Amino acid sequence: MLQPTEIERLLVVMAHPDDVDFGSAGTVATLTGAGVKVTYCLVTDGNAGGSDRTVSRADVAALRREEQTAAASVVGVTDLVFLGHPDGRVVADLVLRCDISRVIRQVRPQVVMCQSPERNLDRIFASHPDHLAAGNAAVSAVYPDSRNPFAFPELLEEGLEPWEVNEIWLSAHPVSSDFVDVTEHIDRKFQALRCHVSQLPDPDGMEQRFRTFMSANAVTAGFDEGTFVEGFRVVQAS
């Protein structure tokens, strides 16, 4: 796993607003605090989120974009891209792969952080079908698409040269290979999560559950008790 001093730019690709904050906001805060430029790429606007049928889906999408932008600022991220694919219907097709490849070539990151394309049966809520599809498309965009000059020639016509990503960090993978100690930034993680007001009917309960989960993972991974970690399956891509 590359260290913050070895990373200049990192691209986060997630299916929905709030996904990065649940899984990785502590890591993002750690990286931005070390001077890494982080960009968020959200595949959908999250317009299928929530259960209030009196609110239009367009209004939900606008609200969730605002919530994600606010949450991003808490952890030092100001560069966000919303791809606008339909929430609940994400498909890892060539259209999405091209869209993500475009962002990779624009950002030119050393690391792409995305959701695991493999279902985690121990954490089924982290394996929403949109998450799996977004992860699948992001991994395919890293290899082979974004580095291949003959994949999506329209990107060359846009002036976007191929780019080779060094590592992929998969969140919510069934098996984590590496862990980031986010204890110093744990409060900022939950401050970011609390920006997603429309999705959190019980923010206090959510925070307690995640603190318990993250501290238990830390002990299992060999960290001192009282430490909080976020886990990733790191894939070498170059």
Model-derived features with residue positions:
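Metal-dependent de-N-acetylase/amidase catalytic core
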Residues: 1-11, 93-238
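Active-site rim/loop-helix segments in enzyme catalytic domains that contact anionic ligands
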Residues: 1-108, 233
